[in-house]
């Protein structure tokens, strides 16, 4: 499936894990992709406060959430958790969003950036950066409705 380059906008990328959420964002012209400190994932979702602060500070207009699909493109248990979290974020943020297949993004960030055995969350934010770079190259365009997810 071929996608056209997404329209100009500043995007937040999230690599959602069970313990941490890696964050990265890009400028509206897709020239730079920067990482942000990873967030500890809270049971009561208090991390949403910091996510909202990043959105305001960097004037972000949409977000993407990585889905760790299996090699055949099927949903994994972690992908289901990421999907649920992405829908939660949409309801909280009311911003256009999309899901992106992030199969092997952690492996790629470990190899590409040489970060191993990281407990700080750096690898999570580097994975969010890779997910965002992939989205910039491949799409899909952001959607405003949860029911219109694209992978």
Swiss-Prot record:
Entry's Gene Ontology molecular function annotations: nuclease activity
Transmembrane regions: none
Cited Gene3D superfamilies: YqgF/RNase H-like domain
This protein's UniProt keywords: Cytoplasm, Hydrolase, Nuclease, Ribosome biogenesis
One example of a Gene Ontology biological process annotation: rRNA 5'-end processing
Pfam families reported in the protein's UniProt record: RuvX
Major subcellular site: cytoplasm
Enzyme Commission number, as recorded: 3.1.-.-
Localization per Swiss-Prot or TrEMBL: Cytoplasm
Domain of life: Bacteria
NCBIfam families hit by this protein: RNAse_H_YqgF (TIGR00250)
Family: Belongs to the YqgF nuclease family.
Protein name: Putative pre-16S rRNA nuclease
Native source organism of the sequence: Prochlorococcus marinus subsp. pastoris (strain CCMP1986 / NIES-2087 / MED4)
